[in-house]
Amino acid sequence: VISASLSQADAESLYGTAADPFEVERVGLTREWIIQLPFDSDRYRLNQIDTAQWMVIAQSEDGIVHAVRSSDGNAPEVNGPLPGTLLWSAPLGLPKAPLHSAGIDRDLVTINRDMNTFGIDSRTGSIFWKRRLPSPPSAGSLPVGDWVYVPLWDKTVYRLPVNPYRRPSNSNSEKDTDSKTSSSSKLSLDPVRIKSHGFIEQQPSRFGEGVLWCTDYGRLTVIEPAEEGWERHEFFLHDNPNGPVAVRDKVIFAATEKGELTRFEDATRGLRLTWRFLLETSLHPNMPRPQIMLHNETLLVSLGEEGIAAHNASNGERLWKTSLQGTFLACIGSHLWCYDIMNRITAIRLIDGQEDAWLCPGPFTIPVTNRSSERIILASPRGLLASLRPRVIGSEQSALQPSTSSSKTSNDTKEETPAESPQPSTEKPEAIKVEKPTPQGKDEPFNFFGK
């Protein structure tokens, strides 16, 4: 899907790059969509890109926030926007203002700008509310359930209601008397400042129905709803974290500057340490922050100059290690795609860590880490966005697409042909499948990388 008209010069500049459909097909992927974001790319640049299962939020330096419909592999909504559609562009704040990660929920997108936090309708792009912050934000805000959490520079977390004009749903479920209704509803909509006991430099994460954040000194804090009010659990890493934590449901993975990889789980009395593993590397002050990515039961950890390692997420056992250095992009099928230090988009096999395929990034020099879906999101500083999905062949492709009509027609033919004559010709179409290999060796159905 090409959602914006590209000039001939732009199309020629994509030849041989990661957005070239022929190059993408060669490595077992398909270009799902490509779009040019509408902003003054001669004066400003694209700076911050955040992904979710159903949306990509991109922020440009001129203060405009763009929302693009994305896909998670499921069938698109009926009469809904197709993947790659520009949903809206909303100007917020002044140009060249500091940009933080966007908080993306199904109905609300939260953006920090200067001393304000904006709540934007995710479908229309209209500003639902605007809240003045008591202190500058230190990281991106996050909507979770009925609340929005904003880390502040004064080592607190500002909690706001998602809908400032309606009481939270958990308060409505309580047994309130008429005398308490007016006062409790007023208090439930008031912002609350929560002490974080440390500086928060990474966007908080969703933890079940609650929220999790980590301070720069390694204090993990979880706040989740309880039968009466809220529960707060904390755990000390005894060292500074070496990057953002990874969360799946109520399981936490974190690493420290001294090179310790840990896993925590939610327990009745707080967080419980499941296992810890000592890595071969430690973080120096000038080194970039490593990454953690979880794919099924494989935990991927970047080791800086030491490369990339994979661990068993259940017990922490080391699976493999490669010397390739790179920034994680996405996990697609049986491969990890990363932007390596040689300015290549490289695929690594998750089973053994071997490099398997390469793409030239071309103008897409902004690494975008996508943990929400099996999609590679390409981004250029001048506002060109593209999505690469796994290539699906034959019957697998029809399974992903809404092909009820085609399945009905195939069933009808099977029912009609025996009525005419029980010829073996009715079995031939089943024997001749679409995914049979063509004479070309590079397009075999399950040999995606042409080897």
Per-segment meaning from a language model:
Residues 58-83:
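Beta-propeller domains
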